[in-house]
Swiss-Prot record:
Family under the similarity heading: Belongs to the UPF0502 family.
The protein's name: UPF0502 protein YPTS_2082
Gene3D superfamilies named in the record: Winged helix-like DNA-binding domain superfamily/Winged helix DNA-binding domain (1.10.10.10)
InterPro entries: DUF480 (IPR007432), WH-like_DNA-bd_sf (IPR036388), WH_DNA-bd_sf (IPR036390)
Length: 233
């Protein structure tokens, strides 16, 4: 089952995934440690300035979703994720997939080349081709898709990939498409309302939204089956 995260939840989960691999001696993490990780000035996009109360509120929501769990330390409460590869979780990812998903949660849409360079503390990709293969796998998994390929921006050599763990993905893509249309209209013939890049971007957004709706239908069907079983009992 694919999780639906808001921006703060994505940041917290991303930080837990990152620190579990890069600084295992500091994992599970305290509220203070998580707040510092969420607000890092490097390796984060956008840079956030979350208060401890905001991070705590996010942790409370994630606890209710069973995406993290808490444990009492010597002096403070500590938290670890149940986002993937946990004993009772549905999502299972390889180390390469975890690295890619973590960077996408922490920094948003990125190219395969950027991901290969930035994941080196979590996983050492042999080359860009291996990174692209990992992204392809994540986009085609039966329990996904977990990433979506965006239309290549004019003048760019590589397309960027975006994570599909947010309900706002489709609207973000469409907004980007509208911005592309505005720029194109200013530079080209005013009668042209869509560029090829914009059409491709809107198509990607619609495909992403359809995939999200399909997952929601599956989840609702499972819940309905559980209710019917309880009624039969």
């Amino acid at each position: 089952m694919k999780h639906n995260l808001n921006a703060h939840e994505a940041r917290v989960i991303g930080c837990l995934l990152e620190k579990q691999v890069t600084t295992p001696e500091q994992y599970p993490m305290s509220l203070n440690g998580l707040t510092l990780a969420c607000n890092q000035k490097t390796s984060r996009d956008p840079v956030m300035e979350l208060s401890e109360s905001q991070v705590q509120q996010t942790l409370d929501f994630l606890l209710k979703k069973h995406l993290i769990r808490s444990q009492s330390g010597n002096r403070v409460m500590k938290y670890e994720h149940r986002f993937c590869n946990s004993e009772f979780g549905d999502l299972k990812f390889s180390p390469a997939e975890v690295a890619v998903i973590t960077l996408l949660l922490l920094r948003g849409a990125q190219t395969p080349g950027e991901l290969r360079t930035r994941t080196n503390r979590m996983y050492e990709f042999a080359d860009v081709a291996e990174t692209e293969e990992t992204l392809k796998t994540l986009s085609l998994r039966e329990d996904g898709p977990f990433v979506v390929r965006l239309a290549r921006e004019p003048g760019k050599r590589e397309s960027r990939f975006m994570p599909l763990f947010s309900g706002d993905v489709a609207s973000s893509l469409l907004a980007a498409g509208e911005a592309e249309e505005d720029n194109h209209t200013l530079e080209a013939n005013p009668r042209e309302t869509h560029s090829f890049e914009n059409i491709a971007l809107e198509k990607t957004a619609l495909e992403a939204r359809v995939a999200q709706l399909e997952q929601q239908v599956i989840q609702l069907s499972r819940r309905l089956d559980d209710v019917l079983i309880q009624l039969d009992d």
